[in-house]
Amino acid sequence: RTNGVILGINPEFTKYNFRMYPNEYHISGFAAYASIPKVYHIGLYGKFNNIIRSLPLTFSFFKTKLLLTNYYGYGNLTNYDKELDENEFYKTNQEVNKISLGFEKEITDKITITFNAEYRKLETNIYNTLIASDIPNNKYGLGNFKSLSGELGVTSDFRDSKTFPSTGTYFFLFYKVYPKFYENMNLYQKLKIDGRVYFNPEFLNKSILALRFGGEKNFGTYPFFDACYLGGKENLRAYVLERFSGDAYLFFQSDLRLPISNIKIIVNGKLGILAFAETGKVFTDIPDKKWHPSFGSGIWFSAIKNTFNIVYNIGFSNELITHYVQTKFGF
């Protein structure tokens, strides 16, 4: 199950100063509503270059019920029933309030280091006792929960375009630690990686082959909503969002994108087709050899020097046929 149609607004304000690059500060707000879970997501983000020279400070706040809308159980071997899903059998009711402060440091124009300190307040309920009984560590994380955390991220981006990459590489490494704090009774940690490569294969003129791998690992005893989740448009497109949860995950994706014609749809642009194949799995303390393949195809339109994209994907797995319409490529 997806979140359906998500409608929202994203106002932005930027103040420029010729002594500061690229600006003095930038503030953006957003508000969104998801049609299927019928929940909201609101937030505010700011980046300030005028407080500490050469060290931009960041601030964010959001309040949402959209982070975890369903819980399908722990591990690779859980059963899924589409009809039960449509009748809200797996539904969770979670509200998250989060505030963070941090900074960004550009080592070069291609490599950035970020640090954030974060406070969260959550309330999570699952009214289906059959689903709640599958939560590991004695349902750890249900009810009210507060946490503090510190995170460090390193991004290396050598792509030729952020919106329509055709060559180059992208790599992201992320570490986060949660110390003991109120309901968080255990120190736990999270490590995450995301690597991508783009090139133009000789066997198909003007095509783009995009390859991606991702992994995540938790260390220590963590609340169930901070498990490593796999499924949905971000990794396994032919499965519902956050279909599988575990102590770790690993996934691989491949996209072949082929332009087929120049076309005008209000503005001049390129029309193309794509095909994808991917697989992934989660890892728990009970070993298994189950992987979850997903494949599909789609059509895309790109315009305004590849900064405006509309992408349609249809995905197939042994559980579902999924459809996505987005304003960006999967990765």
Each PLM stretch: what is its role?
Residues 1-147, 151, 230, 243-245, ...:
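Gram-negative/organellar outer-membrane beta-barrel architecture
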Residues 10-12, 45-47, 102, 153-155, ...:
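Outer-membrane beta-barrel architecture
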Residues 14-18, 30-36, 64-68, 122-124, ...:
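Sequence/structural signature of outer-membrane beta-barrel proteins
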Residues 27-33, 46, 57-75, 115-121, ...:
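Transmembrane beta-barrel strands of outer-membrane/channel proteins
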